[in-house]
């Protein structure tokens, strides 16, 4: 399996950061125990890996990183990155921290077709287990 995410932020300080629209809630292994996942910048597969990035998610946690000091081609806002070998770890280890919703899962079939095997979570899913009974009874 793979996680496909888009670069939506950049930060240029003492380090170069590429911020994705995915986060540790989508793939916990790098944040949890530093697991390595190869990263490909789609459309730049043959470009030189002459930039060094921390590839991060959008959570407010310092360990929300898919890669640290990773040599990659230049990543521009809007580029898609392909995080390899995520297997079944995405959804099974996923969580809703900071109200992050789980993403859809797609299956690439042997004939090249793509099927959605799990839809993305919605806010309705997120709040489905809350019991709002009586919550606003004392508010005037």
Regions found by a protein language model. Name each.
Residues 1-140:
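Charged (often Lys/Glu-rich) extended helix/loop segments that serve as interaction or gating elements
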